[in-house]
Amino acid sequence: MTSTPFRIHAPFEPTGDQPQAIQKLVAGVQAGHRFQTLLGATGTGKTHTIARVIEALGRPTLVLAHNKTLAAQLCNELRSFFPENAVEYFISYYDYYQPEAYIPVTDTYIEKSASINEEIDMLRHSATRSLFERRDVIVVASISCIYGLGIPAEYLKAAIPLEVGRETELRQLLRQLATIQYTRNDVELGRGRFRVRGDVLEIGPAYEDRIIRVEFFGDEIEAIRYVDPLTGETLQSVERLNIYPAKHFVTPAERLEAACVAIEAELQAQVANLEAQNKLLEAQRLSQRTRYDLEMLRQVGYCNGVENYSRHLAGRAAGEPPECLIDYFPENWLLVVDESHVTVPQIRGMYNGDQARKKVLIDHGFRLPSAADNRPLKPEEFWQKVQQCIFVSATPGDWELAVSTQVVEQIIRPTGVVDPEIFVRPTQGQVDDLYGEIRLRCDRQERVLVTTLTKRMAEDLTEYFQERGVRVRYLHSEINAIERIEILEALRQGDFDVLIGVNLLREGLDLPEVSLVAILDADKEGFLRAERSLIQTIGRAARHVRGQAILYADTLTESMQKAIQETERRRAIQLAYNQAHGIIPQPIVKKTSNAILAFLDVSRRLNAESVPVLSSQTLQDLSLEDIPPLIQDLEAKMKAAAQELAFEEAARYRDQIKRLRDRLVGHP
């Protein structure tokens, strides 16, 4: 395992609160603190702080995000900070997933249906390969990393070591490749495939987009090279390397037979149990389905729904937690939980939802009881595997604060911008008062966010302001995700001035142009008017030098009081810091390009007749999670062009695919 130090490449040094936050977090980890919290206000550069902490500690790090989009954004940022180190992306590889389910009321069985994205699967394999081979690894993952992922020891044991000069019989090597689930295809080489041409073996590894070419002289390996899959050009010659399995789930032949025996024993016991309850139909169904699966396992080593037998295939005891991505990490690793107030509850919720569905399948004879052990980790199992953790949030949850032995605040923004000034005004005449405030902002070409409690009120308010000549739009639940992003971009670009919505808390609302946030009915207690929600909403104006928040209310609730006190406390600290250091707040300059809109633009060009030309800027703007579907689109068009003998057009598609793949795996 190599041990290259982490080295940050950034055009700026830590400023404001960042140096003290970095120093405290690093000292806390070195002192053995198991849990710490970085309580960082919006726009204070929390990702940069965490990157500096990772650099100082030099530990393999898992960064956990609560959705794919945030994971992609974090991965992009960290790759820009650490171009010399391995920054990997690990999310669910399903483009579409319908889990197996049974609805007793209508006697409806829904078979599992899924579509696996090959590009994301490659990135998952790349992450585990990096964890085996080096220590300078950062894996940015979604919550899917707490699901089972084979057995690391078996995966590593199954890897095939190759070395120049070593005596290796080619036929034996081909058998080994088949054992670790590579398939021979002498026509079309790709991920998880190999081909032989004379004394040359070419392998498409599961974990990267380069081809491995192994050249033999008799039974001796003469050369090992990485070659370009499109041009065949040699990219790198190496002395030795490991070929890792094409799938994370690797089961040796002896364990497979033992698993079949254990499955048969469990089947007999469960059939007897169902018959004792007079569930004859369920017993017959279970026996028929399981015996078919057993025959498939014995003949081909695989069956549909094989994951439901994972407990037996892995040799685990009943109730024992499955191995997951965390088990691939070497010792002395670090966990960073981003937006912990959202991510930590996700960890708690995954197990319960999974078990409710499985129980119905087991009770009605569709699955053996052991299928319940094909599951995500329970929260207590997850935290038992965690050695040291840093929670990151502007509004950390009560649990994170309770378990943290150190809470490090990061309040000062590098730009000197302070938290918004807060005003509380009565609800009587609130609409006319708000209209006057909106007019002031429109005259200064600034933007306004307004949050209401109901969709109806948002619609009525929008109509009222439109009649009075205000350029206004509103967001609601029926607007899909892409339209929502387009509306937000239009607000930033000045196509309209006021955005009204019910819940404007969702991640991604980074709007430096917004100078006023108005919260109507702020004294109506509930989720949307809770302390953390109010702080998050007020924070939407925290990126503007003239940021203000107006809370319309007739009473001062406890949530309002706490949110106002916290915002004013931060504001006082920020103002004092600026005065002491002679800092004049500078407006945040942020380009309005959006990764998802860049993806849409490319998609539209893909559907045009000519082959798209992707500029470097367009590639840079694309989000990682949006690249795999683009590659699939281009591959389909490339194959269609080749079948029509339009080889020049197919070659241009091929070149674009290569550029997208390079961007995906982090190559410049």
UniProtKB/Swiss-Prot annotation:
UVR domain ranges (all copies): 628-663
GO molecular function: ATP binding; ATP hydrolysis activity; DNA binding; excinuclease ABC activity
Lineage: superkingdom: Bacteria
Motif (Beta-hairpin): 93-116
Record InterPro entries: Helicase/UvrB_N, Helicase_ATP-bd, Helicase_C-like, P-loop_NTPase, UVR_dom, UVR_dom_sf, UvrB, UvrB_inter
PANTHER family membership: UVRABC SYSTEM PROTEIN B
Record note on quaternary structure: Forms a heterotetramer with UvrA during the search for lesions. Interacts with UvrC in an incision complex.
Domain notes from UniProt: The beta-hairpin motif is involved in DNA binding.
Name of the featured protein: UvrABC system protein B
Organism in which the protein naturally occurs: Thermosynechococcus vestitus (strain NIES-2133 / IAM M-273 / BP-1)
Protein's gene: uvrB
